[in-house]
Every structure is written in C-alpha cells, then in structure tokens.
C-alpha cells in the first residue's frame, strides 16, 4: 500500500471515530432500516444501455493530484445534466479532506435525479455503510486495497442486508480474486495505480478475463476518449466510471456525447 493511501485511510479512521462520538452506529443502523427505497446500480449496469454502453458520471470537486478542480460545483445541477445526457448512474465524492467532497453533495444529487447514486469514499468501517444508507446512497464503493478481507466480507453482507449495492474496486489479479471470494458482483477495475497515480486502461482489459460468471465489470479512471471505450468494449466491458474529464469540461454534455459517440440513439 502506498504511503499516500495509508495517510488517507488513517485520516478516514480518525474521522469516523470522531463522527461516532456525535452520532452512534446504533442510531444510524436504526435509521438505515427506514431509509428511502433504493435504486439498483447492479440492475442499471447488468446489460448495455440503449446507447450500447453505460456511463457512471461523477460529481467531483477536486483530487489530491489536481487540487480543487471545480470549487463552485452544483451537485444537483451536474447530476441533472448527466441524467439528461443518458448517464446510467451518478457517482458522488463525499471525502472532504482529500477530494473536497461534501455529504450534502450526495443528498442534493440523489434528490435531483431518478437514476442510482453511488457514494464514493474510503470505507474503513461498517459505520460508513449505515451512514451511506441514511445519506441516501443507492450503492457504496469498497476498495479491496483499503480494508481487510474480513471487513470486506462483513461490509458486503451488511450492504445486502440493508439493500445497498456495492461496487468493489480492484487493481490487480490478487485483489480481484479477493473480491470474488468475498462474493462481490459489481467489480470496479481501477486503471489508476494508487501507488503511482498513473493510469493505463490495459489494467481493465487484463482483469476482465479473470472475472467469474455473473460478475459485472466497470472500468474506472483514465477514460477520456471514444477510442479507449472502443478498446474496452472489444474486451467485453460496457460500463465506465467517468469523473475528471466531466467536471473540468466547460460543457460536460459535449464530453458525454463524444464518449457515447456512434452508440447514441
């Protein structure tokens, strides 16, 4: 694990412990049982959409490598624009310390659209699973590199219990095997190496060959043009998580139109 990722995870653990002192896990668990009806991310991605592909479009204010990219971002407005362009789902960064995200962004985005909304954060505790449900998320991101196999399995079971989908992120064959053993269905193949922050879509092309029947592949990070999508489609991948190129573009609609390309209806 890279030193930088370790720094993020240690800070996240401190954040969670601090929040627990304000709102107990028991309270969140009770609230999660009566949270709003979920929209299924798994169902939205199980087959190619009418454009031939599915895009999870991301609401993202910043990143450690780029700093603040869109300080005035209106999460609800971006989510509506994404949905109107044919996005299958919306991903919302809620990490404040490193990605400048806000929990309020997820709530605003969820209220603005009818498609599933994924909470993208660094999950290090079951507390955050209940928190995500209460926040209004339809799905959460679980990063294999960030948690133990035991916690991964526990979080997946908990997600199933309270009706959340889980996108389980991997970057290597070993991580994919761990995700599969834990029972993951939605597999997010991160083309970005969290140790070096370089991206290479060949990561997804190599990993999809190891996936088990019934699993659903999502290619994440570094996807900026239709040619890359064509290569990934040839490998059998039709789901793509797109973030930075959308929130930094003057017209996200134009970027999405380019990515959908000839697949537009």
UniProtKB/Swiss-Prot annotation:
Q: Which reaction does it catalyse?
A: 1-(2-carboxyphenylamino)-1-deoxy-D-ribulose 5-phosphate + H(+) = (1S,2R)-1-C-(indol-3-yl)glycerol 3-phosphate + CO2 + H2O
| Alphabetized CDD domains for the sequence | IGPS
Query: Cross-referenced Gene3D superfamilies, in alphabetical order?
Result: Aldolase class I
UniProt superkingdom = Bacteria
> What does the UniProt keyword field contain?
Amino-acid biosynthesis, Aromatic amino acid biosynthesis, Decarboxylase, Lyase, Tryptophan biosynthesis
Protein name as catalogued: Indole-3-glycerol phosphate synthase
Q: Name one GO biological process term.
A: L-tryptophan biosynthetic process
Where does this protein act, in terms of pathway?
Answer: Amino-acid biosynthesis; L-tryptophan biosynthesis; L-tryptophan from chorismate: step 4/5
Which Gene Ontology terms cover its molecular function? indole-3-glycerol-phosphate synthase activity; phosphoribosylanthranilate isomerase activity
**Which source organism does the UniProt entry give?**
Syntrophobacter fumaroxidans (strain DSM 10017 / MPOB)
Q: Does the keyword Amino-acid biosynthesis apply?
A: yes
Q: What is its EC number?
A: 4.1.1.48
Protein family (similarity comment): Belongs to the TrpC family.
């Amino acid at each position: 694990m890279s030193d930088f990722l370790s720094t993020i995870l240690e800070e996240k653990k401190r954040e969670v412990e601090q929040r627990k002192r304000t709102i107990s896990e028991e309270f969140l668990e009770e609230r999660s049982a009566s949270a709003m009806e979920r929209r299924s991310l798994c169902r939205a991605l199980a087959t190619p959409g009418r454009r031939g592909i599915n895009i999870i479009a991301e609401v993202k204010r910043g990143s450690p490598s780029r700093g603040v990219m869109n300080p005035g971002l209106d999460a609800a407005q971006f989510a509506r624009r994404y949905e109107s362009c044919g996005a299958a789902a919306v991903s919302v960064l809620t990490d404040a310390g490193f990605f400048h995200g806000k929990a309020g962004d997820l709530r605003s985005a969820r209220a603005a659209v009818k498609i599933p909304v994924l909470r993208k954060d660094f999950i290090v505790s079951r507390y955050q699973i209940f928190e995500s449900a209460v926040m209004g998320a339809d799905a959460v991101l679980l990063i294999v590199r960030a948690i133990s196999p035991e916690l991964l399995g526990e979080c997946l079971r908990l997600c199933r219990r309270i009706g959340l989908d889980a996108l389980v992120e991997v970057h290597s064959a070993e991580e994919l095997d761990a995700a599969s053993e834990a029972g993951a269905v939605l597999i997010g193949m991160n083309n970005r190496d969290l140790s070096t922050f370089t991206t290479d879509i060949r990561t997804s092309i190599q990993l999809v060959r190891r996936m088990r029947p019934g699993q659903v592949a999502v290619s994440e990070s570094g996807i900026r043009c239709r040619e890359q999508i064509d290569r990934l489609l040839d490998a059998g991948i039709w789901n793509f998580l797109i973030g930075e190129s959308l929130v930094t573009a003057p017209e996200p609609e134009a970027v999405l139109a380019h990515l959908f390309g000839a697949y537009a209806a």
